[in-house]
A protein has these predicted regions:
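Transmembrane-helix boundary motif in ABC transporter permease subunits
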Residues: 109-139
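Short cytoplasmic-facing helical segments at TM-TM junctions of multi-pass membrane proteins
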Residues: 180-222
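Glycine-rich helix-loop "coupling/hinge" segments at transmembrane-helix boundaries
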Residues: 156-157, 233-263, 267, 272, ...
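N-terminal signal-anchor transmembrane alpha helix
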Residues: 43-71
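Generic hydrophobic transmembrane alpha-helix motif, especially the helices
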Residues: 140-176, 183-184
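Transmembrane alpha-helical segments of polytopic membrane transport and secretion proteins
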Residues: 1-54, 282-302
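Periplasmic/extracellular loop-to-transmembrane helix junction in inner-membrane transport proteins
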Residues: 36-44, 69-112, 252, 256
């Protein structure tokens, strides 16, 4: 009886120590976490809005100074007002939003296709050793291959149509998404996987509840890179493969400016491509990153 009481006391002590250790770790994690509090509107404007606005204003000032200094011929470097006139004309003609929507719709649809293909492919490569040995190096090689290299064969295989555009996007984005997920899975502590298996989270259930949530940082990095590759692949395809049947996207607009020697049109297309890329990052990927950080206790919202 005394031995049983001693064992019970020791078990209780071990359990209390484990709880104390868990509480200590939770407290340390809370101290290390970055606290996010609601900031005043004036502070947000000063810290988040004013710096990029000032940077854009500085670029415009330097640009205009170069125009006044006549560092090059007018047809090589248009003035800011000439580019703005292009924006105004495109808006007045009702074509500005059409240029943007044509490219965005293609890019987002192609990226969603790449997501549907790249996610299971990445899981397969990460979890099956034979598959990783067989196609892992191929995925890495495809990721380093410039996406513009796929445009000529895609045109020959599929012709000048939207299928060709989507094929180029897939070939550029799928390897990045798959490799990002593989990197995320490789960073999962083995203890988490064993704990999930012990609790019965195996197969698809383990993948959904353990593997995917634990691999989110690497997966999200792969998604961001996959979108960047999708957007660049699409622009390359639109520039090289122009056809009246395809409509006019931002890449075709850039190529039209080159064909007509209109640098103001070229600059307009470049700025629109840049703005769309920034907008997608701010509206989609930045909120996703904050959500992942907050879910992992790296951001604490007061």
């Amino acid at each position: 009886m005394a031995s049983t009481d001693t064992t019970t006391t020791e078990d209780a002590a071990v359990k209390d120590a484990a709880q104390d250790l868990a509480g200590l770790e939770a407290g340390l994690d809370a101290l290390d976490a970055v606290r996010v509090s609601r900031t005043p509107v004036r502070q947000v404007l000063a810290q988040k809005v004013l710096p990029p606005v000032a940077a854009v204003a500085l670029v415009l000032i330097v640009w205009q100074i170069l125009i006044w200094a006549k560092v090059t011929d007018d047809y090589k470097l248009p003035s800011p007002t000439q580019v703005w006139d292009e924006v105004s004309n495109a808006w007045a003609q009702g074509t500005l939003l059409g240029y943007i929507w044509t490219s965005i719709s293609r890019g987002l649809f192609g990226f969603l296709l790449a997501l549907v293909i790249g996610t299971p492919l990445g899981l397969l490569v990460a979890r099956v050793k034979v598959v990783r040995a067989a196609i892992g190096p191929v995925l890495s090689g495809l990721q380093s291959l410039p996406s513009v290299a796929w445009v000529p064969p895609a045109v020959l295989w599929l012709g000048l149509n939207d299928k060709m555009m989507y094929a180029v996007i897939l070939l550029g984005a799928v390897p990045s998404i798959a490799n990002g997920l593989v990197a995320g899975v490789d960073q999962i502590p083995p203890l988490h996987l064993r704990a999930g298996q012990t609790l019965g989270a195996t197969g698809l259930r383990g993948t959904w509840h353990i593997v995917l949530p634990a691999s989110l940082p690497g997966y999200l990095a792969g998604l961001k890179q996959g979108w960047a590759f999708s957007w660049r692949s699409l622009m390359a395809a639109e520039i090289i493969a122009s056809s009246p049947d395809l409509g006019v996207g931002l890449g075709q607009l850039l190529e039209q400016g080159r064909e007509t020697s209109s640098m103001s049109t070229v600059f307009l297309a470049i700025f629109l491509i840049l703005i769309v890329g920034i907008a997608i990052d701010l509206l989609i990927f930045s909120p996703l990153e904050r959500w992942v950080l907050r879910s992992r206790g790296l951001l604490v919202k007061n």
